[in-house]
């Protein structure tokens, strides 16, 4: 029985997925029962919901049903506390006190994090019961680095859970000594200076207050090789090194999330946390700024919010504080000409992904490709670039000084080499849900056609769709005058970007022109040498009015609305404004002035310009270990640096390695559970050091596979798992045969950038109509039967559209799995695909690196973009949003057959990024809550646009908006999600970011600054200075420091912190090599100084570079022995 609310069609879809999962599970289980694998069963438990995931990942046994009951009755957070209480009370088995407390904290944290992230497993090292100096007992939670994956709120709640467990166990509070209190302050400062910064920088007194009042000890294991110098060798602190996990829980958990903890404390009635109220009140403004980037703007005159008032927004500069070399700044914070804020959601945006016109993606020299990450000014910290061609495109000035609106990709490609300046970058389409998620005040909307149409509807005016989308210029003016409505957005220029005096200068110049009947244009005399004409021409450019420049004239084809906007009656050829000087003097600003002289209302085109810079480039590539290997079969140093087992066999080499093994009754050493030489069942023990019989295993594997000669097969040097149990060599040979690679857990993966999509056209995903019908896509969004490839269909929540290169790679993986079934397990081939398109309909797993739970998905097609398209719910099920992160896909049968927990590294974080449990059915209630804020409307109401002018909080208008949250627990939670803006093609635009195609750092930075030079909203000198200061200088200093502290290494793989006294490798006697080269130290030196000179950086920067140069020279250049050329003697 299906446990989620869904329509009959969706229920059938989920049943089909479950049936396919069961089929693959059964097949893989049969293969494992043959005894050739590490275990004789599939090692990935299936979970239908959060409760199953929690039990599967952290336990205890039989807890799932009770979690379901409690969550249903109480809600998630109260249920987590109650389940922790019941565990320590022994309701799920008898545990020792410390074991019970640890189990309680882990299980409660798993409930809070939906049983997806690895934090409950890896983020909590252990829980201990320790003693205060007065002899009383208290609880200590040992946090580890992976607690970061839980997020700040969950980190804080883990501490709250610990306090709740402590009370229920009758333990006393933690009573720290003064040295222990001060130790935290020292560690926080050291962490920020030597490791990385926190989101929130706490004051020393805040840390002291928190540590003295938190009832459990927040401690942890050492995470960084940096030691404290002051408060060392404390009896109850086991290490002198930084405890990174503990600091994260304290600073980014308890201190940063204080308001959220207080809400839970008040709601749950937990005592002992009142001290947080005082702490919160002292720093509430700081917390809100970091958490929500709220209140980052102000109005000059809040009592009058009409469109004629000046409007100022405070620029958010955080995103541009650090600029990486080779990654352009597209717009400085809130700079005129930047990305214009526009509200709405296209079918490929939302959930932190914003839409941009595909034309601008080409005009910035391909630095904005589909899937490229941008760091943005607002509403969130980052976004992902996707094309939406129904929003405003860029406005550019060409080399011949003409100004042109680039509204198609064809135009962008035609004129890209002729662009002198990008005057306006175009729109950035942001959905209401992203403002709601970030609790960012709703900023005034730009003047757009959807707002305009709402006004016409509200006044019951007649109009055609063609008029809304592309009105004739005369028709637009006539309609505005007759109906007394604002001028159509198409002909509303950026009057607010120039002053009222500038408008008057431009007006005087334009009125002096004449009408050219031959080409229906307004013609003006143009002379670049005339400063007055040049100034007026610049104002024409800045308002974004298209015009063509010839040798002696400027021709304006959109003359009709332009002239009428400036108070000139074109039809009567007369100026209709009286006393222009008086109006200029009596109006308060540009918008007031233009509305005074125009015969109709003119709205402000843009209120908000959003700044942005490039973050990470898009990614679509197979997952490889470093170096890439084909199998988890260790060969030590026998394969030399290239790690080729076939080369080791040819040269007769072997090596001693530590590995699980057993002596078989046949006399051979078996590394597997089934002896490959006699077929007997054995049980390897160990690990122990043995001389590996590489040659014997190699030829036996080839014999088993009936392969005469294999190509190059790359293997690992040694296992890092606890038992050091290995994978059969046959799998490595078959992977190499099919040109694929293995990951640490035995699976074969493909990584790609997460991008949302809720609707698609068959033509976009390269799948036939009949195949889509077979997969359950019978009707389009309008309810019409699916008949052609251009109809828009709603994506089912567990279907994914993979990159083309992923399909090619999975084609090879399917060949490997079929070979494995046929040649190794002696079973029928499963996939039997002859071309990549035949993989459509097969199941995969989607997984994020910081999690331990996978989600079942189904391939329904591929796109040319280097991104992984999936439903926002699907990404949210992996605890991800879509702001530029990347996750992995891998074939479900591959995971069932080849994954093993016993391959995972025996170190902290080793169980992250491994499918320890698999969710089969996606429940929207149990995914990352951020997606619940995504709006699901087909159009925004007029009230939204009007309210946006008031600068209200997003929650205040939630009642007039529709979000995913409103659909939960209803059949409509899976279907009928709307979008407001159409786009023709989801993978339109550059497919590869220029950053990935350029070679040297000099090439990258030159291209970066070339982009900055031609964008009006960017200051190239500032970009150059920021690149030097935030990237090059820290790298130069860091590499210089690393050189002086470096260790040495040997070609055999041995590493030494200091040079051995013998001067050679202690293992093999070979010459030792430096780990940091001279080239690594000075690689950015020349490019930094070249940039500083070329872009006239400040004297401070130039002098700092000179100091670094002298430091490098003092290290590498011998002052006493100076190399000279022979010609120097003849000077």
UniProtKB/Swiss-Prot annotation:
GO BP of this protein: DNA catabolic process; DNA-templated DNA replication
GO MF annotations, alphabetized: DNA binding; DNA-directed DNA polymerase activity; single-stranded DNA 3'-5' DNA exonuclease activity
Similarity remark: Belongs to the archaeal DNA polymerase II family.
Pfam families: PolC_DP2_cat, PolC_DP2_central, PolC_DP2_N
Taxonomy, superkingdom: Archaea
Name recorded for this polypeptide: DNA polymerase II large subunit
Record gene name: polC
Role description: Possesses two activities: a DNA synthesis (polymerase) and an exonucleolytic activity that degrades single-stranded DNA in the 3'- to 5'-direction. Has a template-primer preference which is characteristic of a replicative DNA polymerase.
Keywords annotated in UniProt: DNA replication, DNA-binding, DNA-directed DNA polymerase, Exonuclease, Hydrolase, Multifunctional enzyme, Nuclease, Nucleotidyltransferase, Transferase
Entries under NCBIfam families matching the protein: polC, PRK04023.1
Annotated EC: 2.7.7.7, 3.1.11.1
Assembly and interaction partners: Heterodimer of a large subunit and a small subunit.
Catalyses which reaction(s): DNA(n) + a 2'-deoxyribonucleoside 5'-triphosphate = DNA(n+1) + diphosphate; Exonucleolytic cleavage in the 3'- to 5'-direction to yield nucleoside 5'-phosphates
Keyword Lipid metabolism: no
InterPro entries xrefs: PolC_DP2 (IPR004475), PolC_DP2_cat_dom (IPR056172), PolC_DP2_central_dom (IPR056171), PolC_DP2_N (IPR016033)
């Amino acid at each position: 029985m299906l446990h989620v609310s869904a329509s009959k069609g969706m229920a059938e879809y989920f049943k089909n997925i479950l049936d396919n999962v069961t089929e693959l599970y059964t097949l893989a289980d049969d293969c494992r029962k043959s005894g050739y694998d590490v275990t004789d069963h599939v090692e990935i438990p299936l979970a239908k919901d959060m409760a199953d995931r929690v039990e599967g990942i952290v336990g205890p046994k039989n807890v799932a049903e009770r979690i379901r009951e409690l969550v249903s009755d109480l809600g998630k957070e109260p249920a987590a506390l109650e389940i922790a209480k019941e565990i320590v009370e022994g309701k799920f088995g008898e545990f020792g006190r410390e074991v019970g407390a640890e189990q309680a904290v882990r299980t409660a944290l798993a409930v809070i994090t939906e049983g997806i992230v690895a934090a409950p497993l890896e983020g909590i090292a252990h829980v201990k019961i320790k003693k205060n100096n007065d002899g009383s007992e208290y609880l200590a939670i040992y946090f580890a680095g992976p607690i970061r994956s839980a997020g700040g709120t969950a980190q804080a709640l883990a501490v709250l859970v610990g306090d709740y467990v402590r009370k229920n166990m009758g333990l006393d509070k933690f009573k720290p000594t003064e040295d222990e209190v001060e130790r935290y302050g020292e560690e926080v400062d050291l962490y920020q200076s030597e490791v990385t910064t926190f989101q929130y920088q706490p004051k020393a007194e805040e840390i002291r207050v928190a540590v003295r009042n938190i009832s459990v000890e927040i401690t942890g294991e050492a995470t960084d090789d940096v030691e404290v110098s002051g408060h060392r060798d404390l009896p109850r602190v086991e290490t002198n090194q930084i405890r990174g996990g503990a600091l994260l829980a304290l600073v980014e958990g308890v201190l940063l999330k204080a308001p959220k903890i207080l809400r839970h404390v008040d709601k749950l009635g937990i005592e002992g946390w009142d001290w947080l109220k005082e702490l919160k009140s002292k720093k509430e403004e700081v917390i809100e700024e970091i958490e929500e980037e709220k209140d980052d703007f102000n109005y000059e005159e809040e009592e009058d919010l009409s469109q004629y008032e000046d409007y100022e927004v405070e620029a958010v500069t955080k995103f541009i504080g650090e600029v990486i070399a080779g990654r352009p700044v597209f717009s400085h914070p809130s700079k005129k000409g930047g990305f214009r804020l526009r509200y709405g959601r296209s079918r490929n945006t939302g959930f932190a992904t914003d839409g941009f016109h595909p034309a601008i993606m080409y005009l910035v020299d391909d630095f904005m490709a589909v899937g490229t990450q941008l760091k943005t000014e607002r509403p969130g910290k980052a976004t992902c670039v996707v094309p939406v061609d129904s929003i405003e495109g860029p406005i550019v000035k060409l080399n011949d000084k003409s100004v042109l609106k680039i509204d198609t990709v064809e135009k962008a490609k035609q004129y890209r080499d002729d662009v002198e300046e990008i005057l306006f970058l175009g729109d950035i389409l942001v959905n209401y849900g992203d403002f709601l998620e970030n609790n960012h005040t709703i900023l005034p909307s730009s003047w757009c056609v959807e707002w305009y149409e709402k006004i016409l509807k509200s006044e019951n005016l007649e109009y055609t769709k063609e008029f809304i989308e592309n009105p004739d210029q005369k028709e637009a003016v006539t309609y505005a005058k007759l109906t007394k409505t604002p001028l159509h957005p198409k002909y509303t220029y950026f009057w607010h970007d120039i002053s009222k005096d500038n408008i008057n200068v431009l007006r005087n110049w334009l009125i002096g022109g004449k009408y050219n009947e031959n080409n229906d244009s307004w013609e003006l005399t143009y002379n670049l040498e005339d400063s007055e004409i040049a100034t007026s021409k610049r104002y024409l450019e800045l308002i974004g009015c298209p015009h063509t420049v010839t040798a002696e004239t400027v021709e304006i084809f959109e003359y009709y609305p332009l002239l009428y906007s400036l108070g000139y009656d074109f039809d009567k050829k007369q100026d209709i404004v009286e006393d222009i000087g008086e109006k200029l003097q009596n109006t308060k600003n540009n918008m007031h002035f233009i509305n005074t002289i125009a015969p109709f209302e003119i709205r402000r085109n843009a209120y908000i310009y959003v700044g942005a810079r490039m973050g990470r480039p898009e990614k679509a590539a197979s997952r490889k270990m470093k170096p890439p290997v084909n199998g988890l079969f260790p060969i030590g140093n026998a394969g030399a640096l290239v790690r080729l087992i076939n080369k080791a066999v040819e040269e007769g080499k072997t090596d001693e390695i530590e590995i699980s093994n057993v002596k078989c009754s046949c006399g051979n050493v078996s590394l597997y559970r089934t002896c490959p030489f006699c077929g007997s069942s054995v049980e390897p023990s160990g690990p122990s050091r043995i001389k590996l019989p590489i040659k014997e295993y190699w030829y036996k594997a080839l014999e088993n596979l009936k392969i005469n000669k294999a190509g190059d097969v790359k293997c690992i040097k040694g296992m890092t798992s606890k038992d050091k149990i290995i994978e059969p060599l046959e799998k490595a040979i078959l992977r190499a045969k099919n040109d694929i690679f293995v990951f640490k857990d035995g699976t074969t993966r493909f990584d790609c950038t997460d991008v949302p999509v809720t609707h698609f056209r068959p033509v976009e995903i390269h799948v036939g109509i009949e195949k889509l019908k077979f997969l359950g896509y019978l009707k389009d969004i309008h309810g019409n039967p699916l008949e052609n490839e251009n109809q828009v269909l709603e994506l089912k929540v567990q279907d994914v559209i993979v990159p083309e290169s992923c399909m090619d790679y999975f084609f090879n993986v399917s060949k490997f799995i079929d070979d494995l079934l046929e040649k190794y397990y002696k079973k029928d081939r499963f996939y039997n695909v002859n071309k990549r398109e035949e993989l459509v309909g097969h199941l995969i797993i989607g997984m994020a690196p910081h999690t331990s739970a996978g989600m079942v998905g189904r391939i329904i097609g591929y796109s040319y973009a280097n991104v992984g398209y999936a439903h926002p719910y699907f990404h949210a099920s992996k605890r991800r949003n879509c702001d530029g992160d990347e996750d992995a896909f891998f074939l479900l049968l591959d995971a069932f057959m080849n994954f093993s927990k016993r391959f995972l590294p025996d170190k902290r974080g080793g169980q992250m990024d491994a499918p320890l449990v698999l969710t089969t059915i996606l429940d929207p209630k149990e995914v990352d809550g951020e997606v619940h804020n995504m709006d699901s409307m087909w159009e925004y109401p007029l009230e939204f646009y009007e309210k946006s002018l008031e600068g209200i909080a997003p929650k205040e208008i939630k009642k007039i908006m529709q979000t995913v949250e409103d659909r939960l627990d209803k059949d409509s939670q899976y279907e009928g999600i709307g979008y407001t803006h159409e786009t023709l093609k989801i993978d339109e635009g550059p497919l590869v970011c220029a950053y990935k195609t350029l070679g040297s750092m000099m090439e990258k930075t030159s291209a970066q600054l070339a982009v900055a030079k031609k964008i009006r909203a960017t200051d190239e000198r500032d970009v150059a200075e920021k690149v030097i200061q935030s990237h090059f200088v820290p790298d130069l200093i860091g590499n210089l420091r690393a050189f002086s502290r470096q260790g040495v290494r040997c070609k055999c793989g041995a590493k030494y912190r200091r040079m051995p006294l013998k001067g050679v490798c202690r293992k093999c006697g070979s010459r030792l090599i430096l780990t940091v080269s001279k080239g690594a130290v000075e690689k950015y030196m020349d490019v930094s100084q070249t940039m500083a000179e070329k872009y006239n950086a400040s004297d401070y920067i130039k002098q700092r570079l000179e100091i670094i140069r002298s430091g490098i020279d003092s290290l590498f250049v011998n002052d006493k022995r100076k190399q000279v050329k022979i010609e120097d003697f003849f000077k």
